[in-house]
Every structure is written in structure tokens, then in C-alpha cells.
Amino acid sequence: MRALVVLALAGAQALAPSRRTFLVAAAGGAAKASASTDGVVQQITLPEAVKAIITDANPDWVRAVVQAGFVYRGVAEASPTLRRDPYDLYSPATYNSARAATYFRSLDAALDKNRAPGPRARKAHLAVANAEAAAQWGTAASIWPLGATTYAWGPTVFWPAKDRAITVAESLRVDEGLADCIRDGREVLYACDASIAVPVSMEASLRAGLGLL
């Protein structure tokens, strides 16, 4: 059944015209949108979220989620949202730690030096395959990157770090094995143009809408 769901979602993504440009543009002008200098969040309905996931969610991400489970972030909103979140891993305020900000800068420096593929913390976000862990940051919501997405994973959590940034950079798995990451309950660093977030309280309805029951 799960294999059929993956094929159905992938088929819909291949056949349907992309709605991503429309969705992102709508987020910029919607009355319900809250925007910062480099971030936009728009509240949407669950049916809109389901449709966007089916037509625009990254196929590799969807495939891994179907195989292994959802990936979450903590968000401020209690309803489904279309998101272009500001990048904050370089900010000491994110973890209330200057060392954390330095760590992510060092991680990027190591990746840049090695010309490694994949995301960079300066233009990426962290999600985790554990709703309780995500809830420490707000309302736990499953995350569905839209369109082209790159991701990397390795440590159980990126911060607090158990290893030096250069060591982590050398051991990251990039754009592969996301289902393994999810099964292990690890964090994943990902970069995309926009994403859909659906609160865990609506997960049963989301699963029904996506045919994942």
C-alpha cells in the first residue's frame, strides 16, 4: 500500500502544473501573512496543504516520509502554513548561545573548503524526526519542503555538538538515506524555497488526505 501511495504522489507531482510560484507569491500578499525582512508565513487550510504536498512537495522527501515517518519543526502557528522562514542558525539568539552560532559558521566553512554538496546552515533549517523534540521549539508540525530540496544528516542533533564542526562536515550524508535518518529520530539540515507545515494535532486528517492511513 505504501508503495502505491509513493507512486500516486510522485505521479501527481509529475503531471500537475507547478503551484509553487503561485503559493509563494500568495504568501507575500495575503492578509493573514506575517512577514519579516527575510521570512513569510501564510496560514492555509488543511485541504490546501494536502494539495500543495501532492503537487509540489519534494518527491525524495515524500518517499522517505512514507517509508519511515514524519519530520517535524516547532512553529508558532496552530494551523497549517505555507512558510518561507528566515534563516537563523547563525544567530546566537536561536540557541541562546554564541558558541552555537560559531559552530554553524564553522560547519559551513568546513563544507565550503571541501566544496561539499548539500545545504549550508546559513541558508537552511533544521527539522527532527521526533515530534516531542520539535515541540520544545513551539507547536510540533510536520514539514514538507516544496520543489528542489537538498538535505544533510549525521549527528543525532547538530547542537549541542558532540564533535568538532570539521568532523561533522566530513561525516554528513547528503541527499541520501533520509528514511534511515527518520527511523533513527535524528535531525536533518535542509534547504528549500518554501515548505508546508501541518500541526501534529491535525496529523490524522493529513494522513487521511494523503492516503497514508
Predicted segment positions?
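N-terminal chloroplast transit peptides
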Residues: 1-16
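Short amphipathic alpha-helical segments that mediate assembly, nucleic-acid/protein binding
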Residues: 2, 19-20, 46-47
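ADP-ribose/NAD+-binding catalytic cleft of ART/PARP-like enzymes
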Residues: 36-120, 192-213
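ADP-ribosyltransferase catalytic core
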Residues: 112-172
